[in-house]
Amino acid sequence: IPLCLVGSEMCIRDRGGKGANIIFKDADPEAIERGALRCFRNSGQSCNAPTRMLVEKSMYEEAIERLKKYTESFEVGDPKKEGEHIGPVISETQYNKIQTLIQKGIDEGAKLVAGGTGKPDGLDKGYFVKPTVFADVNNDMDVARTEIFGPVLSVIPFETEEEAIKIANDTDYGLTNY
């Protein structure tokens, strides 16, 4: 990451991400779960996490059902514990930001498929976030435009390859697309 000098202040430039994972109707159906896993890894705290999943309309309902099942079975727990699961986010400030953005997604009309606000059951200590999936998102909603830096996946339907590319490229964060 490049360093810069501004007056007498040193700063580090960050390259954020709001990557899109494009799923076409002829894709391996397991690409849906793999995309969710890539979003949720590290509790979503990766600037290259594919946090927008663009799904071709002809397989959209199947994708939403698969995401619901997968996300509801996804484990959250102590990072010292053996096994596949995600741990807490970095701080109370980040936890609160994620909770605010999840609520904003609900308020803006995105359909909550799995997860939501609050902590996962049994995890009262620490800043644990429920892996969350929103359906029926459009690219103008905050959950699609803001780098949440948490385990929150926004699913956006598309009809044509050109439309998918247009949506994928319509972001202020150009770090990655899948």
Predicted regions: what is each one?
Residues 108-114, 173-178:
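Bilobed periplasmic-binding protein-like "clamshell/Venus-flytrap" ligand-binding domains
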Residues 16-18, 45-52, 68-100, 117-128, ...:
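Flexible, acidic loop-helix segments that line cofactor/substrate-binding pockets
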Residues 22, 75, 102, 121, ...:
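Conserved C-terminal structural/oligomerization subdomain of aldehyde/semialdehyde dehydrogenase
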Residues 28-37, 57-75:
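Conserved core segment of the aminotransferase class I/II
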